[in-house]
């Protein structure tokens, strides 16, 4: 070819990352998890890992509507679920028990019977005695505890209630012979406690904090002979330090399930080659994370406030604090600095403690109301309506949370104490303009007239209602239970969206089937269905050939229009989202 310049146009479109758009959002109580901080689940096993599935109340095992809904949603093809946990009262996280390094703290261990092997010369009368020690030499605070003598020379238990301070290996504690209530006029010898390394608590290297809140996260208890924790459960955690290396300043951290044991450890997460050196790429806060999410309620629009420099990479814990950071652990020759080697955690295992909060009503509050027994007496699954308020307000934040439809199974529009929150949910959906609220109008065993009358009080094309209640199999307990329709409608939408598109009607025998429903509360006649549809309530119908089926797709808009149909409303929502996302890229660009 002859010399010249060839001009070639290479069109590379700009692709911008958009906020995560999830399918369904659900607000309700769960067994565990962060309180009111929405979290995305991508499978039912992911949901159970974060939020649990069953709980015990009054010796009975239950599941929340939230868990039943999540199970059915993912079974039907749902891929993303935004969960917001609501609770009753104050909830806090659990923190790790002492995570020791090799530096002694001078405090005696408070673990039951820890100093039992250090006792000598015990004589006295069988009884329980309080021990109060005051130091006669050295500095520090004397320990206190209790000792139980089962006979004149046998100690069945000794407990340290306060570990004091200033103790070291080889120090002795004397319990005066006259303090143990000797009988028969016989005075025994003094009881001597000679402290060894196992009796003295080492300093804490760092502290972990659970992401989940509530007393269910407390696993602290004395280890059994097989290494199990009596308070350990499938829902809480324990920790283990392995492979500490003082030459490199590294160690491994295992997060284990609370109900495992030494022979069969159930390891949930493993973090290898961690460091306490903030300059290291494996610094523990960088690898695990240290961020805390709180809800800011000081303004009319609630939002999630984030503190901490490192995003949480663990699904279960964050680093609350590092007691002794080891800045530049190695010196210029590659050797560990002498002052830092004692800061590395030693091989050990422990549990979590200090969490507070439960949704299980106490004896004075009476038993919680679950499944079809929920009523208007201000007790729905152990909660009251006001417990939902913050979560509902937060999820009105369109900029932070994107979802296609939202439910609050357990809140009933007709319940006087629930009306305000249901009204807020409906108003939020309309104001956002990008989501559909699925609500329940009446409680179990309501009449058709009550349902239609309640529906007529609503005029909103961003809201849909279904009736009647349905019976399904609780996947976690095996019980056949009645649930409000909003518990299972997300699964119908999920199947519709997986099999077709959002602008197809999520109804009828092709896309409105409810295969996990055993029966509807009531078998609707053609006249019943007509009456419901006139009131814009979508009937859940029982057909002899196809089973339980959603046989309606109306919104609760009174005036006849295109948006009184769910598929049209969802189509317009989808169009607004897509056009809005594209238009954002054109703001401040040349448009003339």
Predicted segments — roles?
Residues 95-105, 144-148, 192-194, 219-220, ...:
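Short amphipathic beta-strand/extended segments with alternating polar/hydrophobic composition
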Residues 127, 167-178, 230, 237, ...:
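Extended Gly/Ser/Thr-rich low-complexity repeat segments
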């Amino acid at each position: 070819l002859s010399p010249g310049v060839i001009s070639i146009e290479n069109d590379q479109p700009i692709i911008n990352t958009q906020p995560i758009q999830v399918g369904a959002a659900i607000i309700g109580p769960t067994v565990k998890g962060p309180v009111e901080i929405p979290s995305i689940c991508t499978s039912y096993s992911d949901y159970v890992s974060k939020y649990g599935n069953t709980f015990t109340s009054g010796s009975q095992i239950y599941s929340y509507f939230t868990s039943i809904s999540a199970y059915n949603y993912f079974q039907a093809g749902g891929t993303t679920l935004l969960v917001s946990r609501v609770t009753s009262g104050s909830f806090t996280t659990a923190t790790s028990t002492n995570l020791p390094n090799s530096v002694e703290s001078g405090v005696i261990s408070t673990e039951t019977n820890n100093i039992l092997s250090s006792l000598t010369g015990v004589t006295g009368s069988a009884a329980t005695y309080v021990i109060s020690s005051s130091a006669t030499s050295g500095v520090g605070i004397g320990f206190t505890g209790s000792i139980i003598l089962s006979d004149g020379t046998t100690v069945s238990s000794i407990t340290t209630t306060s570990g004091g301070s200033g103790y070291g290996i080889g120090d002795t504690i004397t319990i005066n012979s006259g303090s143990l209530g000797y009988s028969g006029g016989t005075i025994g010898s003094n009881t001597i406690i000679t402290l060894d390394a196992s009796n003295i608590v080492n300093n804490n290297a760092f502290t972990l904090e659970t992401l989940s809140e509530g007393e269910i996260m407390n696993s602290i208890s004395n280890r059994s002979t097989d290494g199990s924790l009596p308070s350990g459960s499938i829902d809480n955690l324990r920790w283990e330090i392995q492979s500490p290396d003082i030459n490199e300043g590294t160690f491994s951290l295992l997060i284990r399930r609370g109900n495992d044991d030494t022979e069969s450890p159930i390891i949930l997460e493993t973090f290898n080659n961690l460091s306490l050196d903030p300059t290291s790429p494996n610094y523990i806060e960088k690898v695990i994370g240290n961020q805390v999410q709180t809800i800011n309620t000081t303004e009319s629009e609630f939002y999630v406030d984030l503190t901490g420099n490192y995003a949480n990479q663990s699904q279960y814990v964050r680093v609350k604090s590092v007691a002794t950071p080891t800045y530049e652990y190695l010196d210029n020759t590659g050797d560990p600095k002498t002052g830092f080697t004692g800061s590395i955690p030693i091989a050990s295992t422990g549990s979590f403690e200090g969490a507070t909060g439960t949704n299980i009503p106490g004896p004075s509050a009476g038993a919680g109301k679950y499944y079809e027994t929920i009523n208007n007496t201000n007790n729905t699954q152990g909660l009251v309506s006001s417990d939902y308020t913050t979560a509902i307000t937060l999820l009105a934040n369109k900029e932070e949370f994107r979802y296609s439809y939202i439910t609050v199974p357990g809140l009933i529009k007709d319940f006087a104490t629930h009306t305000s929150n249901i009204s807020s949910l409906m108003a939020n959906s309309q104001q956002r303009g990008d989501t559909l609220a699925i609500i329940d109008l009446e409680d179990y065993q309501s009449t058709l007239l009550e349902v239609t009358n309640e529906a007529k009080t609503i005029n909103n094309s961003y809201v849909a209602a279904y009736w009647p209640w349905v019976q399904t199999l609780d996947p976690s307990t095996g019980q056949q239970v009645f649930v409000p329709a909003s518990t299972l409608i997300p699964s119908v939408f999920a199947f519709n969206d997986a099999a077709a598109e959002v602008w197809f009607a999520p109804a009828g025998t092709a896309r409105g089937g409810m295969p996990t429903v055993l029966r509807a509360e009531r078998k609707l006649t053609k006249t019943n269905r007509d009456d419901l549809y006139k009131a814009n309530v979508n009937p859940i119908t029982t057909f002899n050939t196809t089973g339980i089926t959603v046989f309606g797709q109306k919104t609760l808009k009174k005036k006849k229009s295109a948006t009184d149909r769910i598929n049209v409303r969802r189509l317009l929502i989808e169009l607004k989202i897509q056009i809005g996302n594209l238009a954002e890229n054109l703001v401040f660009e040349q448009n003339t």
